[in-house]
């Protein structure tokens, strides 16, 4: 570094990239590198793969370098494509409709700068994939959405038309014997607050109006679902106590997917009015502040990111209005830690109580977090 006058590791990386690029160019090859190669200065003829969002691709295109857009969201196919995945994924949520909607030419670029975007690429990383069938599951049918997204002029893209044709494409997968994902048929579930803060609402939606929804409640959460003991869904279901609910989407009386289940664990704070004095990180917004009191405890691991709120560079302060004076015997706060993903648990947690919402008294503070086997 001293002999080359390099100030830091970024300039060292740039030196290496430029040197190896000259070698590759001499062999008639082109260097393609992840967007980290922007750090310290870009090699003259390098093509940039923009994976950490779109910022790297935008910067490279403005410098008149060719770019392949491959942002983790929505083009990492090892991310979940269902909110009800039955196996562990690396995290993230990239459903097929999100893939189809992606535009590889960022709006921040001028028409001339946009010409440097060669296209887009989807990636499948195999840390959580143990066999070829699982690879097929991650690829199909999202590959169809990727292909049409890239090959169709922007003005002709039509999700509704694509959706109508998707069942025929799925028949092809079946003819091939491909292990395609049926996540497209999954119900979309959302837990919402009630108007009077009594319990929560469980909202179910299908991808298409042609599909109907049926559901039932499992009195014993250990019992298996019973598709014959069901009710037809016509509006969000009000939940007022702990229990497990099962839902199916149907067409012409036949179930289209595996059942989707939701377990609710109620306490005094469930469904109550909650206010955050600091905003959650845009990378981990969950379903907003209500995520903390919606009665849902994440048992699916990090892939269920909508059940997490993340905070970056600021304390998390939540004010929960219980509505009436309540006797509190204990407070449990669930946190998540995964250092490999740069997610850290809080330094400490402090609980305050108030009778009027103005004067607060510290009730307890701890920095002793007990590891849970749930997540």
Q: Language-model segments: what does each one mean?
A:
Residues 1-44, 51-59:
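Active-site neighborhood of glycoside hydrolase catalytic domains
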Residues 6-14, 46-50, 129-136, 156-159:
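Hydrophobic alpha-helical scaffolding
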Residues 25-35, 60, 67-71, 153-159, ...:
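Acidic/polar loop patches that form or flank catalytic/metal-binding clefts of enzymes
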Residues 32-69, 74-91:
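Substrate-binding cleft/loops of secretory-pathway carbohydrate-active enzymes
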Residues 38-43, 55-57, 74-79, 126-131, ...:
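Flexible loop/turn segments at secondary-structure boundaries
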Residues 81-82, 86-201, 207-211:
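Substrate-binding clefts and catalytic carboxylate motifs of secreted carbohydrate-active enzymes
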Residues 164-318, 336:
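Short, compositionally stereotyped local motifs that mark structural "simplifiers"
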Residues 300-375:
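Aromatic, loop-rich ligand-recognition surfaces of beta-strand-rich domains
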């Amino acid at each position: 570094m001293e002999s080359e006058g390099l100030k830091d590791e970024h300039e060292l990386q740039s030196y290496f990239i430029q040197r190896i690029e000259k070698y590759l160019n001499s062999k008639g090859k082109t260097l393609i590198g992840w967007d980290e190669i922007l750090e310290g200065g870009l090699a003259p003829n390098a093509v940039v793969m923009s994976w950490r969002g779109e910022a790297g691709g935008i910067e490279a295109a403005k410098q008149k370098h060719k770019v392949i857009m491959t942002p983790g969201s929505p083009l990492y196919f090892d991310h979940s494509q269902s909110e009800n995945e039955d196996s562990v994924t690396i995290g993230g949520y990239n459903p097929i409709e999100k893939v189809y909607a992606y535009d590889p030419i960022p709006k921040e670029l001028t028409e001339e700068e946009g010409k440097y975007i060669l296209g887009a690429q989807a990636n499948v990383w195999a840390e959580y994939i143990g066999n070829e069938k699982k690879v097929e599951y991650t690829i199909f049918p999202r590959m169809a959405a990727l292909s049409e997204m890239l090959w169709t002029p922007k003005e002709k893209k039509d999700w509704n038309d694509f959706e109508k044709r998707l069942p025929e494409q799925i028949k092809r997968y079946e003819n091939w014997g491909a292990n395609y994902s049926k996540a497209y048929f999954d119900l979309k579930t959302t837990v919402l607050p009630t108007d009077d803060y009594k319990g929560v609402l469980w909202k179910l939606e299908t991808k298409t109006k042609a599909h109907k929804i049926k559901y039932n409640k499992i009195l014993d959460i250990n019992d298996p679902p019973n598709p014959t003991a069901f009710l037809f869904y016509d509006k969000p279901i009000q939940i007022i106590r702990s229990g497990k609910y099962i839902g199916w989407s149907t067409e012409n009386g036949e179930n289209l997917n595996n059942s989707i289940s939701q377990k609710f664990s109620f306490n005094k704070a469930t469904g109550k009015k909650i206010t955050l004095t600091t905003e959650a990180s845009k990378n981990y917004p969950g379903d907003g502040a209500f995520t903390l009191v919606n009665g849902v405890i994440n048992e699916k691991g990090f892939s269920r990111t909508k059940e997490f709120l993340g905070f970056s560079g600021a304390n998390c302060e939540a004010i929960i209005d219980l509505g009436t004076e309540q006797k509190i015997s204990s407070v449990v706060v669930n946190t998540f830690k995964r250092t490999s993903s740069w997610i850290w648990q809080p330094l400490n947690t402090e609980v305050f109580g108030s009778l009027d919402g103005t004067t607060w008294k510290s009730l307890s503070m701890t920095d002793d977090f007990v590891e849970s086997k749930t997540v």
